[in-house]
């Protein structure tokens, strides 16, 4: 396998963070995601190719637009898929800690399983399962722009560079971190296409979640969004506060800043953004757009984005150590969001799908939150299901209801404590392994 083609079997699992690639195994017992969820869409997609936009290998960047004539609401979805910043991560030598689509985007990408099934937000419905019907959600019938990910730079890099094999064995890799250029060109296209936008939602998962916050200012200004009509939902792509060298995420931020030439991009943000602390994007958004609506979702035990954040920078760190740093950083983010009336969040503890990474992908099953969840008391042990030792004394807030209320203009703040509710849930025990086996 030639390094210059930059194909890695491990990188196939980099689609969401580092482990969401839809694939069907060979053999009679093969199961694909389409066999498990009643999802997907049949949109009449328009493929858009803008001259000068490129994937990491220099091939043409492409994105897709669904224009519903009856809608004035626009959703822009930034796809996830890991990240890379050196030879090991950009070549695939680092295994799962790499970036998606290193060989560009085929013309039928939008109809392939991963793009078609990945997002209930795009499809406008939480997909059903056997005995569980499909449920329409707040983004049903919206116009959609789907931004695939193929630049390894969370859609905001601005650097063409060469990565050399430190062992001197394999040939160098020429890598186009051109996410920012691609994103700006796409936003300008959308501005020309959609002239009368009512509500505007920019969102993304994993690497795309980072992009949703980092690009909100550019999107808002270029598309001329009315104040109070803008929404940003970051799914599992947090920019944690990292103001000094002691911060847990500081090494990651410094590394990508150099590799992707972030200084050339960050200068375009308002003065309320502190370029020495990427986590200040939370303050910038809240201050610059006090009437708009922002939200974060992610799991407290995410073992995907957390690995990208710490594993390469803390040699020898184990799973417990990774999650400890993640939860420390998450509390810093929560404290920062609590300072602003226009920031919401829904943070469940765990979901045994995709290493608890991403709340809004594939299905909303298990993405609910109950801040008062606890162990059952002894006298509740016989409550159904008897195999479930955890209980929500009130009611779970589902992702569907969270989105409906938040897009309706309300602020919601939900953080679950430690619990194993999802692990013991009978439905999750059936569906979770099936989904994971199809990833």
Predicted features along the sequence, with ranges:
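C-terminal His-loop and adjacent cap/lid subdomain of alpha/beta-hydrolase
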Residues: 31-439
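Cleavable N-terminal signal peptides
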Residues: 17-18, 28
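Bacterial N-terminal signal peptides that target proteins for export
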Residues: 3-16
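N-terminal signal peptide c-region/cleavage motif recognized by signal peptidases
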Residues: 23-26
């Amino acid at each position: 396998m030639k390094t210059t083609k930059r194909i890695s079997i491990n990188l196939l699992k980099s689609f969401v963070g580092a482990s969401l690639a839809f694939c069907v195994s060979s053999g009679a017992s093969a199961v694909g995601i389409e066999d498990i969820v009643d999802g997907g869409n049949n949109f009449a997609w328009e493929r858009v190719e803008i001259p000068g936009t490129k994937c990491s290998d220099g091939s043409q960047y492409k994105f897709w637009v669904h224009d519903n004539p009856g809608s004035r609401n626009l959703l822009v979805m930034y796809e996830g898929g890991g990240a890379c910043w050196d030879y090991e991560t950009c070549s695939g030598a680092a295994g799962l800690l790499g970036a998606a689509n290193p060989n560009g985007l085929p013309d039928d990408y939008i109809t392939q399983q991963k793009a078609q099934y990945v997002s209930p937000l795009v499809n406008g419905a939480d997909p059903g399962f056997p005995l569980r019907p499909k449920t329409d959600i707040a983004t049903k019938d919206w116009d959609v722009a789907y931004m695939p990910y193929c630049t390894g730079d969370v859609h905001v890099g601005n650097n063409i560079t060469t990565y050399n094999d430190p062992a001197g064995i394999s040939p160098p890799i020429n890598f186009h971190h051109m996410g920012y250029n691609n994103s700006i060109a796409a936003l300008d296209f959308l501005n020309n296409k959609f002239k009368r936008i009512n509500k505007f939602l920019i969102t993304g998962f994993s690497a795309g979640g980072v992009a949703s916050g980092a690009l909100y200012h550019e999107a808002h200004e270029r598309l001329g969004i009315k104040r109070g009509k803008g929404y940003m939902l970051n799914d599992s792509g947090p920019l944690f506060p990292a103001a000094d060298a002691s911060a847990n995420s500081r090494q990651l931020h410094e590394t990508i800043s150099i590799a992707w030439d972030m200084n050339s991009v960050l200068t375009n943000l308002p003065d309320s953004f502190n370029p020495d602390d990427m986590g200040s994007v939370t303050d910038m958004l809240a201050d610059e757009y006090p009437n708009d609506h922002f939200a974060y979702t992610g799991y407290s035990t995410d073992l995907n984005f957390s690995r990208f954040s710490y594993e390469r920078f803390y040699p020898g760190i184990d799973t417990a150590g990774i999650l400890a740093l993640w939860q420390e950083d998450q509390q810093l983010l929560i404290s920062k969001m609590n300072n602003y009336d226009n920031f919401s969040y829904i943070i469940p503890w765990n979901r045994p799908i995709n290493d608890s990474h991403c709340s809004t992908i594939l299905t909303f099953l298990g993405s609910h939150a109950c801040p008062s969840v606890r162990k059952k008391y002894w006298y509740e042990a016989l409550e159904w299901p008897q195999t479930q030792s955890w209980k929500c004394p009130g009611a779970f807030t589902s992702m569907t209801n969270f989105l409906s209320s938040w897009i309706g203009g309300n602020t919601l703040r939900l953080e679950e404590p430690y619990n194993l509710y999802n692990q013991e849930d009978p439905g999750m025990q059936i569906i979770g392994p099936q989904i994971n086996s199809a990833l």
